[in-house]
Structure formats: structure tokens, C-alpha cells
Amino acid sequence: MIDATELGDVAKICGVKYDIGMESRDDTHEDIAPEKKNNIVQDITYVAILKDYGKDVTIPEPEGYDPKEFACACASPVCITPKEPDRVWSKDMMITYGRLPNHKYMINWPIEGNDYYINLIEMTPEERLKALEYAKHYTMCFVY
């Protein structure tokens, strides 16, 4: 069975044996594979569209905001130990990546940004709702 649904949860719902996540480098012999197998199905990203109003308009600080979580989203003096040193790009690259017409910007940044890695397949519907709400909150923290 090949499950190509959004969440990849048809096999679980059907009671079919399944395996999820990325295989390890030892399993695949691929340099791009992670060193250890994981259960990441697909990152959840709540994309944000922002508008530049030309003046300081800052959203309220989200509860639990920790600037260290996003310190290496782009190259800066506070980025000391990036998770992926080869992928730390400039702030200009980040802004250009999501530039839209009419002074708007799409915020969809995979590099220590607003991608939220979670395995929704193994969760109950209630747990999924909480996790998805947290993913939205995570994007708000990144925007802040």
C-alpha cells in the first residue's frame, strides 16, 4: 500500500502495518539522510502573510516566546551554533524569498523558522487539534 494523503494516515486508519519517517543514513547510504531514523512525516507550517506598513507595527509578544528558538533563522551575531551551518542565509535572502506584490511578505521559512516537526499520525484527534494550534502559535512566535 502506498499512502499519498496529506497526513499519511490511511494505513493506520485501515489497521495496515506501516512505517513512517526518514530512514537513517546507514539504511539508505544517502548523504542527505539523517544519521538516525526519525518519525517525521512532513513538517507542519502555518504560513503567514505580512504587510509592510512603513512604520513600526509589532504584534503582541506571544506567550512563551523564546528568541533563542529562532536565533539562527538567518545569519546574525546571535547565531552561534546553527543546526545546519550550510543553510544559514542572510536576512535579505529570507525577506526576498517570500516577497510578494503590494508590500507583502510570505513567511514560510524552513531554516530554524516556522516549520514545526511533529508526527500527527500517532495522535488522537484531540491531540492533533492541540498540536496544530501549537503550530499556529509557533508561527506567531517566529513572526514576532
Briefly describe each language-model feature range:
Residues M1-Y144:
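Aromatic-residue-lined binding/catalytic grooves and analogous aromatic/hydrophobic interfacial grooves
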